[in-house]
Regions:
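Short, exposed beta-strand/loop patches in secreted or surface proteins that constitute
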Residues: 1-3, 26
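Metallo-beta-lactamase
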Residues: 6-9, 15-17, 32-35, 41-42, ...
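Residues that act as N-cap/strand-start positions at coil-to-secondary-structure junctions
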Residues: 19-21, 93, 99, 118
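Residue-level detector of beta-strand structural context in well-folded domains
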Residues: 23-25, 101-103, 122
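Active-site HxH/HxHxD metal-binding segment of metal-dependent hydrolases
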Residues: 40-107
Length: 208
């Protein structure tokens, strides 16, 4: 696990059937840490998670990012958070907190509902009003499967066969341009640490 930005840590797993890394994030907030889409860490990474306790919430951005969430929940006793429209699709996983567009997770992470890949796909905007690092960095946006960083240095959508409704997803993504952000953190593929909004705008202009 490494600190990608002050108070924001990442680690990843590689799978033979995907040409990109699957990334998890640990976000330190006032008095707690929130995990997002956590994959299995390397065995020698576990002590790093103990350092950033208490881990109070684990966020799933979509139904396909269950990954190692139950291992983390059992180890740290964290509440599991997911989009309200994703809860049924996540069964038999039990969701402790269902969130909707505009909700704040842990008082700082603003929920952006991005339906299309799946009904409850969501992104997280690090609200600059409540998150000092986001304010200093020009805004931070985190996405699950709505956009991926593949190939490295570029943005793309996941394969069409994995999308519930491709036209709806493309419409949903337009709302990202309503937010001010420079950093784009991605749970699939390579993050963009500078010029993130410009890169998203350029990518959206390529979509039919």
């Amino acid at each position: 696990m490494r600190e990608i930005l002050p108070g924001i840590f990442t680690w990843g797993s590689t799978y033979a059937d995907r040409p990109w890394d699957l990334n998890g994030y640990a976000i330190r907030l006032d008095g707690c840490t929130v995990l997002v889409d956590p994959p299995a860490p390397a065995e020698d990474d576990w002590p790093s998670f103990d350092v950033i306790k208490p881990i109070t919430k684990i966020v799933l951005t979509n139904r396909d990012h269950i990954r190692d969430v139950e291992v983390f929940r059992a180890r740290f006793g964290a509440h599991l958070v997911a989009g309200a429209d994703e809860v049924k699709q996540l069964a038999p996983i039990t969701i402790d907190e269902a969130v909707r567009e505009g909700d704040l997770i842990a008082g700082a992470l603003h929920v952006i509902h991005l339906p299309g890949k799946s009904a409850g796909e969501m992104g997280l905007y690090f609200d600059p009003a409540y998150h000092a690092i986001s304010r200093e960095m020009g805004g931070i946006l985190l996405l699950g499967d709505a956009i991926i960083g593949n190939p490295p240095g570029a943005l793309s959508l996941i394969p069409e066969l994995k999308l519930d409704d491709s036209p709806r997803l493309k419409r949903s993504l337009r709302k990202l341009l309503d937010y001010d952000f420079d950093v784009l953190l991605l749970c699939d593929g390579q993050a963009v640490l500078s010029g993130g909004k410009r890169k998203v705008a350029e990518f959206l202009n390529t979509l039919a």
